[in-house]
Structure formats: C-alpha cells, structure tokens
C-alpha cells in the first residue's frame, strides 16, 4: 500500500520535474536540472545565500533564507516566489521585535526553519545567546515578527517544530551540543503547552553506524504527517580529509509518541 501524506493542502503550482531518463543513481530524489534557482548574491547586501525554509503563502511561496552579509555575519531574509523557482529576495533583514513592538534583533541568525502551526508561522534559527542557541519568533502576516523566548540554554541547534500539536502539546526536535562543533550529535525531542516553557525531554535517535551519519545528525524540515507516522528528513555528517560531508536521511516517528523511531 502506498504511503500517503495527511493534513497537507493540495498545491497545484508546486514545482516538479520528472526523473531524468539517463539518471543512473538509485536515489529516490534527484536534483533540478536548472539549478541553481537563486544566485549566491541576490542583493548587494548578501554575499552568499543558502539554507532556505519555504512554505506556501497566498498564491505562491515565501521563504526565510540564510544570507551571509558582505561582512561575513549571517542573518535571515525573506524571499518571495510565484512558482518556487524564480525568487525575489528582500534587501532588508527580517525585522524582529519584542512583545511591545520594540526592535529585538539577534546578533546573528542562520540555519532557519519555517513551520505553520494552526494560523501562526514560526521561524526557528540558530542564534547567539552566550553561545549557539535556538532563537524563535512568530508571525501571521510576514510583516510583524515577534520574538519568543529561547526554548533552551546554550548549546543547542537544529530545532524543528512539528506542524501540529501532538497530544495537545507543541513538539520540538533539537540537537544539544557543547561549545565546540557539535560533537554530541544526537536528536532529542521536547514538549511545551505554550511555546514558552519546554520539558519532558526525550532522546529520539543517535548518530548511526553508517559512515555518512557517524559524526552528528540533525533535523531538517518540519516532520510530514503520513499514514505510516511522522516522516522526518534529517542530515547526517561524516568527517573526511576535506572537511565535513553532509548527506540526507529519513526516519519514521510514531504518531502519538514521536520519540519512538519506527523506521530509519
């Protein structure tokens, strides 16, 4: 029986390209033949851009993008597209504010995630809070971006929010680490009744025995609800003589207890 996605709206304009006839690898995914869809410096302020987080918005798509400024400091920017292929990137940084509407800009921001829960969009990124930590904000219109309390103390990264509450609680995947370059490398899950206070931390899965995920792993996009459970795409990292190599893996987490890994 085919696995089906649940609670996912139909997207008639989602970009798609069939698998090339001469594609020789057995991988279930393949690269878009017209890559890159976005140049490395789409605005004068951005020297390099990558790590995008994309959701449907109005009659097209909106993205939160990691843009490294010309001074080397990373930040997050908004991108807009009608078809998911051709993008316009805003020149100004995402303008984060506090609950009173006063500016509350992080020192830096990178590796963003973007998730819709109910009628609110949540932006999650790696921020500077006495070390690498998880920053969070919310918006309903992509004009006002209100900061939320950081869910954890440093050091932590790769936070991924589930797209709906599970058993009445928000669920968040993350990867705790030390002050170095993430040697801990395992994925944990936490829950919250209100997106402010987090607890009930549970281990989800650790680094694998496969070479490509032997150093560290981390959650990618928001988990996808399917007939088999929560489909989680994650990255695995291996160390080579030329530095880190990143690969993509997949896992199925239990519907009601997503700390349980059913398939990997």
Q: What annotation goes with each model-predicted range?
A:
Residues 1-107, 115-215, 224-264:
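Beta-rich carbohydrate-recognition and catalytic domains
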Residues 220-222:
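Active-site/ligand-binding surface loops and adjacent short beta/alpha elements
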């Amino acid at each position: 029986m085919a696995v089906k996605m649940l609670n996912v709206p139909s997207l008639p304009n989602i970009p798609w390209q069939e698998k090339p006839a001469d594609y020789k690898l057995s991988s279930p995914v393949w690269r878009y033949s017209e890559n890159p869809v976005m140049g490395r410096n789409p605005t004068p302020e951005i020297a390099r851009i990558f790590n995008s987080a994309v959701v449907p918005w109005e009659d097209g798509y909106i993205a939160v993008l990691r843009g490294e400024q010309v001074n080397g400091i990373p930040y997050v920017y908004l991108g807009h597209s009608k078809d998911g292929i051709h993008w316009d990137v805003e020149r100004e940084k995402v303008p984060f504010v506090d609950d009173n509407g006063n500016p509350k800009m992080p020192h830096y921001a990178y590796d963003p995630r973007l998730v819709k829960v109910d009628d609110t969009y949540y932006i999650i990124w790696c921020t500077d809070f006495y070390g690498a930590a998880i920053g969070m904000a919310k918006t309903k219109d992509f004009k006002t971006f209100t900061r939320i309390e950081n869910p954890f103390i440093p050091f932590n990264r790769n936070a991924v929010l589930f797209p709906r509450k599970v058993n009445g609680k928000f669920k968040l995947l993350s990867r705790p680490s030390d002050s170095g370059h993430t040697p801990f490398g395992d994925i944990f899950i936490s829950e919250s009744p209100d997106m402010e206070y987090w607890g009930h931390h549970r281990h989800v899965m650790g680094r694998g025995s496969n070479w490509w995920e032997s150093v560290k792993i981390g959650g990618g996009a928001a988990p996808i609800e399917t007939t088999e459970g929560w489909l989680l795409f994650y990255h695995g990292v291996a160390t080579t003589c030329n530095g880190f190599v990143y690969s993509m893996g997949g896992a199925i987490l239990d519907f009601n207890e997503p700390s349980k890994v059913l398939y990997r």
